[in-house]
Amino acid sequence: MSPAAILSDVPRVLLLSPPSLSSNPDKLAELLNQYDKNTRDLQMIDRLAAGLVSLPESTYNLVLLLTDIDGTSTESERLVGRDVLQQIARTLQPGGIMKYHDGLSAMIKEPARTEAILSGLIANDKGELVKPVFEEQSVLLPFSINRSQKSIKGININKSDQQPAILQKNIVTLTNNTNDIFNGLEGDDDELIDEDELINEDELERPIIQPPECRPKAGKRRRACKDCTCGLAQKLEAEDKRQRANADEKLSALKLNSGEIAEVDFTIQGKTGSCGNCSLGDAFRCDGCPYIGLPPFKPGEEVKLFDNDVQL
């Protein structure tokens, strides 16, 4: 057998020391010499509480809290909080014990004792805090449907002498006492319900009441749901169509025919603006003339604008 396998069977001990004890190396060394150095580990409670170190999972059979330098447990219990106790419960093997090194485990005061119980530890008859051992067991659950005692196609399903199927380890076991479970294959009495029969014509013609949460708020237009059934989607669609029709109507009113275009198109020979002075220059042009800034040109001469550059 390998040395690692031998050490794995030896109980492991974890010593948790308060900071005050580390200030006295002689006393700490005396406590460490009481345990085999191959099977014991030492951790400082303050470093564990600060999250600077972490404990391995399911490793130790015994976790010992060392008392303070003055022999009390004030400093240890102050540092042992919920996070530390959760790590202790996790690092203990099932059946592992947590106590003080002098055996005064019952002296662990509140709230540390309550936090230890909430972390998963329980108190035994000696007052020690122990990590419980959860045994694996199978539970028999009868699975049966009591209907008529029939068989399908020569297969007798109503056999009560069949042995239950025992599954391995902690898996729920079902007993095979199914009484005519396939009886529904012969004739199903369930009838399909016509959805149209659930609502009459009066209910269909009734106006849809819009829920308060679907009503648009002031200053904000609410979007309809993807599967809208309250009528908001139809209302918004009608509003969009009405606005589009109004916009098209206004746009058509601004359209000019060929004759009207010729009246204001100065590139057509013989056509001038209402003032008749657009081609004479800025001195003769109106304030709103589109040709302000252009040099004088002859009536009928083509004028193009490219990037604010005038080309005649």
Swiss-Prot record:
Gene3D superfamilies: Fe-S cluster assembly protein Dre2, N-terminal domain (3.40.50.11000). GO terms for biological process: iron-sulfur cluster assembly. The keyword Metal-binding applies. Residues 7-139 are annotated as: N-terminal SAM-like domain. Residues 140-204 are annotated as: Linker. It is found in: Cytoplasm; Mitochondrion intermembrane space. [2Fe-2S] cluster binds at residues 214, 225, 228, 230. Residues 275-289 are annotated as: Fe-S binding site B. Its cofactor is [2Fe-2S] cluster; [4Fe-4S] cluster. A motif (Cx2C motif 2) lies at residues 286-289. GO terms for cellular component: mitochondrial intermembrane space. Residues 214-230 are annotated as: Fe-S binding site A. [4Fe-4S] cluster binds at residues 275, 278, 286, 289. Pfam families: CIAPIN1 (PF05093), DRE2_N (PF16803). One of its GO terms (molecular function) is electron transfer activity. Belongs to the anamorsin family. Monomer. Interacts with TAH18. Interacts with MIA40. The C-terminal domain binds 2 Fe-S clusters but is otherwise mostly in an intrinsically disordered conformation. Component of the cytosolic iron-sulfur (Fe-S) protein assembly (CIA) machinery required for the maturation of extramitochondrial Fe-S proteins. Part of an electron transfer chain functioning in an early step of cytosolic Fe-S biogenesis, facilitating the de novo assembly of a [4Fe-4S] cluster on the scaffold complex CFD1-NBP35. Electrons are transferred to DRE2 from NADPH via the FAD- and FMN-containing protein TAH18. This is Fe-S cluster assembly protein DRE2.
